[in-house]
Each structure stands twice: as C-alpha cells, then as structure tokens.
Design a protein with these regions (language model features):
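Short, low-structural-confidence N-terminal segments
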Residues: 1-74, 302-320
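N-terminal targeting/tethering segments
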Residues: 29-146
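FKBP-type peptidyl-prolyl cis-trans isomerase
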Residues: 34-62, 93, 159-164, 182-188, ...
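A C-terminal, polar beta->alpha supersecondary segment
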Residues: 37, 90, 122-124, 133, ...
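Soluble non-cytosolic domains of exported or imported proteins
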Residues: 50, 69-87, 99-103, 131, ...
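Surface-exposed aromatic
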Residues: 70-75, 178, 224-226, 277
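Proteostasis/folding factors centered on peptidyl-prolyl cis-trans isomerases
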Residues: 131, 135-183, 211-215, 235-282
Length: 320
C-alpha cells in the first residue's frame, strides 16, 4: 500500500510539474527567447530581435511626434537589411582607414539639436548653448526611449556612411557623357502607338506630353527628365538610351508598373541632345555617389561573413 501511495504521489508531482511547465514554456518562448535571437551578423558583430524592436519603436515614436504613419508591413524587413548594410559600411570604412572621431560626433549632435539657434540667438554664450543642447538632447532621448550611447551609435554609423560616400565620390569625374532626356508616360499600348505615329508626322514631343501624359508634373515640364549620365538611369534602360536611341527620335514604349495604383503603363523616351562631356549636376553627383556606395556594399557582402535571418514568425512577434 505504501508503495502504491509513493507511486501515486510521484505521478502527481510529475503531472503538476507538467501542468506548471506548459505556461512557463510558453512564457519563455514568447517573451524571453525571441529578443535574444540573432537576426543580423556581420563577422563578429551581431544584432538581435530585441535591438530591432527598440529601433522600430524609436521610428514609430519619432513619426507619431511628427504626425506621420509608419508602414509596419515593410519596416522590419527594411531595418534588417539596413542593419547589415550599416555594419558593413562601418567595418569596411574602418578597414580602409576612415575614422569618425568623438569631436566629429559631438559636432554632429550639436548641429542636429541646435540647428534653429544659429540665426535667432547670436548673443547666446557657449555655456548657454551647452545647457540648451543638453536639455533638448535629454528630451529627445526620453521621447524615443534610447540611451545616449544607443543613439550615438546610430549617429556614428551615419557619419561613417557620409565619409565613405565622400571617399568614393572622389573617384567620380566632374564631367561625363550625358543625354538631355525626356519621357512620356501613357496609359495603354494603343496610346503609345498613337504617340509614335503623331511624332513621326511632326507633332512636337511637348504637345504629345500635354495631350497624353498620365503625370501632371511631366506636363508642367514638357516631359523633361534632365541632362543625365548613363549610370544615373535605371539598369534596364540606361544602355538602350545611350547606345541605341538616336538623338531626335522617340523610343518604343517601355512597360512600367505603378505599385500604388497596381496598374501597368508605358513610357516613351526622347533624347533631344547629347554631349560627350558635360559637367555633372549636384543632384546627379549625389545619385552617382550613392550608387557607388551601393556597389561597394554589394562587393563587401561577398568578402565578409554576413548573415541575415528574419521570418514570418519573428515578424508576428514584433507585431504583437
């Protein structure tokens, strides 16, 4: 009888432990484990779900304070990619001798939080400005719920990217071959053929833009895109525009897709002029410099140990 009682007691204890362990396991798997899961790793540096959640909340709070809404459907995936990119930029920049000093970081923070005091308070002393900076910085950190160290890591990565852009931008020539490009977007392939027929019969391109364009801004500018170097254009059209489209002619319609309206439309391009060497505009230079960084990062991904892991289950945890 005593042996049977012991067996019953032991079974009761085991059953009780099982009953207790189920909610404990659920609590651990729901609240303890997910924040520690690594989602980005670049060589020896890693970021986990907890960090991603903190960054997302920061952006949400900033956006809410500015009266804007955040697209939570795409934001986490973009953050994961950006974390990997920013870490590659930081490590790669340091590897080629680029540095961000404490003084540069301090100057950037002061510029950010004292920007509106430059013209309105010229009589303020350095001590006054320091007090104002500290108070504004404190309020900002409280709003986004980050520590000073956490926010300064973000600002440091931004500075590294800017310095890398400057470094790579030094290799971009001041002058490049360019075309004076115009574009006309129309609703259907039939309209595109009408445009081509009328252009062949002598109708000016600007008149065709005014009659057929689906873009009001294009009508205002007569369809002018800009003087552009090759690499500023989308990879799907740049070689065609530069190597095949004759000056003064109009292109075949190029199918495009508008993700906002979920509709297909067609674009016809027109090169009015071409110059073998032309000064690169500031806007085009910025585009080329950004493209240079993108290409550099792509190459760095092949040279470094980079892992990203973010799936639907992790997204569901973030969305809770």
């Amino acid at each position: 009888d005593r042996q049977k009682q012991r067996i019953v007691i032991i079974l009761g204890i085991i059953l009780a432990l099982l009953v207790i362990s189920i909610p404990v396991y659920g609590w651990v798997t729901t609240f303890i484990m997910p924040p520690r899961v690594t989602i980005v790793r670049v060589n020896d540096t890693s970021y986990n779900m907890g960090y991603l959640l903190k960054m997302m909340r920061m952006v949400q709070r900033q956006s809410e304070s500015e009266g804007q809404r955040v697209n939570l459907g795409t934001l986490p995936f973009q953050f994961v990619n950006d974390l990997a990119t920013d870490e590659l930029v930081l490590q790669g920049s340091q590897a080629i001798g680029i540095k961000v000093t404490k003084e540069e970081l301090t100057e950037r923070l002061h510029d950010e939080f004292l920007r509106d005091t430059e013209d309105t308070d010229r009589a303020a002393t350095e001590a006054d400005l320091l007090v104002e900076f500290r108070e504004r910085y404190r309020q900002f950190l409280n709003q986004i719920q980050l520590t000073a160290e956490e926010y300064e890591e973000i600002a440091t990565r931004t500075l590294y990217r800017e310095k890398l852009e400057e470094h790579l931008g030094a290799t971009i020539p001041d002058q490049l071959p360019q075309v004076h490009l115009f574009g006309l977007g129309v609703k259907t392939a039939e309209e595109a053929e009408e445009v081509r027929t009328k252009f062949a019969r002598g109708t000016p391109f600007a008149d065709l833009v005014a009659e057929y364009s689906v873009d009001p801004e294009a009508i205002r500018t007569d369809g002018e895109i800009d003087w552009v170097p090759r690499d500023v254009l989308d990879a799907t059209i740049k070689d065609f525009i530069f190597d095949e489209l004759v000056v003064g002619e109009i292109s075949e319609p190029v199918p495009q897709f508008n993700s906002e309206s979920n509709q297909e439309f067609y674009v016809l391009y027109h090169v009015a002029e071409r110059e073998e060497l032309r000064d690169v505009s500031e806007a085009n230079f910025e585009n080329l410099r950004s493209l240079a960084v993108t290409k550099w990062v792509t190459a760095q991904r092949e040279l470094n140990d980079v892992t990203t892991s973010f799936d639907s289950n992790q997204y569901a945890w973030l969305a809770k």
